[in-house]
Amino acid sequence: MKFSVLTLFPQLILPYFEDSILKRALEKNLFELEVLNLRDFSANKYQKADHTLIGGGAGQILDPEMIENALHSVKNPKHTIFLSAVGKPFKQIDAMRLAQKKHVVLVCGRYEGFDERSIELGADEVFCIGDFILTGGELGALCLIDSIARHIQGVLGNAQSLENESFENNYLETPNFANAVFKSKEINKIPAPLEYSKGNHAKIKQLKLDLSKLRTKFYRLDLFKQHKS
């Protein structure tokens, strides 16, 4: 699989892949990463990347011809995602689906965002990562890549790490407890559920499901209400 990131600030993207799990995955060629500087595709000799708004208003928007040129430079087939606050919220099910793609292109917004024609002509999907505003789409792109890459075979050392995660079946992941002895009196005041240590896997599974439901009801009532029981 390949990820291509189109951004005005490549230096914000590259350091994220210099350590930990995704660094090892790149070294093993489990996925490819390409980072393109949008300014390189500007028709302006000074690499100007933005324009004022028609009809007035504060801020600038990204040059649509620059976006078009950059997207044309990326080989097909590709699935193009624009990162913008106007997009639909990115969810776990999207990460699982997009992990099946061969090439995902992520276009990072900046300033007041995109000319609407860029979205209409270039985007297969538009995503945001929450109901809040960032200075650019780079963090969103990194979030998507991280979330998608985890579902590529071999990226996680233990495939079981993907099982029973938060948002599977719209429940949050069950509370977890370390299998260790601690010196901290405060930690020891809160014992792990006794059932976890008894070895009855059927009962442990049911308890984890019950705790998962309780946690979802407490933290994410919106998800909990999606279940009839």
UniProtKB/Swiss-Prot annotation:
Stretches of the chain forming a coiled coil according to its record: none
Main location class: cytoplasm
Protein EC: 2.1.1.228
Record's keyword terms, sorted: Cytoplasm, Methyltransferase, S-adenosyl-L-methionine, Transferase, tRNA processing
Binding positions (S-adenosyl-L-methionine): G109, I129, G130, D131, F132, I133, L134
Entry superkingdom: Bacteria
Pfam families linked to this entry: tRNA_m1G_MT
InterPro entries found in the cross-reference section: Alpha/beta_knot_MTases, tRNA_m1G_MeTrfase_C_sf, tRNA_m1G_MeTrfase_TrmD, tRNA_m1G_MTases_N, tRNA_MeTrfase_TRMD/TRM10
Cross-referenced Gene3D superfamilies: 3.40.1280.10, tRNA(m1g37)methyltransferase, domain 2
Molecular-function GO term, any one: tRNA (guanine(37)-N1)-methyltransferase activity
Catalytic activity: guanosine(37) in tRNA + S-adenosyl-L-methionine = N(1)-methylguanosine(37) in tRNA + S-adenosyl-L-homocysteine + H(+)
Entry's Gene Ontology BP terms: tRNA N1-guanine methylation
Catalytic EC class: transferase
Subcellular location: Cytoplasm
GO cellular component term, pick one: cytosol
Role of this protein: Specifically methylates guanosine-37 in various tRNAs.
PANTHER family hit by this protein: TRNA (GUANINE-N(1)-)-METHYLTRANSFERASE (PTHR46417:SF1)
NCBIfam families (UniProt xref): PRK00026.1, trmD
Family named by the database record: Belongs to the RNA methyltransferase TrmD family.
Subunit and interaction comment: Homodimer.
Name by which UniProt lists this protein: tRNA (guanine-N(1)-)-methyltransferase
Species classification: Bacteria, Pseudomonadati, Campylobacterota, Epsilonproteobacteria, Campylobacterales
